[in-house]
Amino acid sequence: MNPYPHLRPLLFCLNPEIAHNLTLQILSRAAVFIPRIKAGNPIHLLGHTFPNRLGLAAGLDKNAVAISAFDRLGFGFIEVGTATPRPQSGNPKPRLFRLPEHQAIINCMGFNNDGVVALCQQVAAVKKRTRALIGINIGKNKLTPNERAADDYLIAMSTAYPYADYLAINISSPNTVGLRDLQHGAALCELLQRLKTERDKLSAVYEKTVPLLVKIAPDNEREQLDEMLSIIEDSGIDGIIATNTTLDKTAVTGHRYADEQGGLSGKPLTEKSTKIIAHIRERLPDLPLIASGGVMSADDYYAKLEAGADLVQIYSGLIYHGPQLIKDCLRMPSPQR
């Protein structure tokens, strides 16, 4: 029996951010009571063996408080964060909106988090008994100007490095002013070069190489996207996560929340993100690629794999469909390529 259809109306009666935080609190306290799901076909990627191809996207468990619960629910990997060097409260509330008619969410959270040190303490407490791999998503603080953004990423990376199975470089959130400017041209080149250089030093110190992946936005013009892909390829960065939320709210025009600031996720992002995955795979056939965006069903999950993704993450789909979506995705066959 799937209880989530009965629980969802109760959760949706609450303010979205309150419901989100309450759910995380319950999961963090009740993890030991969740039956462990052992499902999926392992895949070797990024120097690791992932238990399966399905992961939790960053943003749901920003402070890594419910890793054990998500691990027991069956995820093959869990991406926590976004974590910044210093704690920050994020953007003013309200900043999270549900659009059930569209199976969508708009968020303008603004990297609210307890800081990378606190997150790493949470990861360290559970990592040895966690089956899923753990990715740590890092970003810059709101008050750090773009000219010094690399310093923030370097601080976060060096702090998180011992605890991460991979690190995700978030330069694509629409909710930190100017952040997406780091996706282009000289700014992207410099950032990736500095991160790669520091990663090589950390690899020697810790005697392990933690893969670096860049998380990109879905709103780039094709020429911009191709420029980004060329820079990423030349940089030696290990992979791409595509995509973050979109600023294009055409699909929800007329909804009472359509004009809210922030990024749109969920079903309206499904087709756009899948097309970007296919384009990236065509351009970079061998680069590890994680799909994120608009996975609302097992068919969406499989479509991302068919488009060329190696791994797939969910977030909004979990809000609308609950843990049953995890089971449905893990029942899907591996793609034939």
Swiss-Prot record:
Keywords: Cell membrane, Flavoprotein, FMN, Membrane, Oxidoreductase, Pyrimidine biosynthesis. It is a peripheral membrane protein. GO terms for biological process: 'de novo' pyrimidine nucleobase biosynthetic process; 'de novo' UMP biosynthetic process. Its EC number is 1.3.5.2. The active site is at S173 (nucleophile). Catalyzes the conversion of dihydroorotate to orotate with quinone as electron acceptor. This is Dihydroorotate dehydrogenase (quinone).
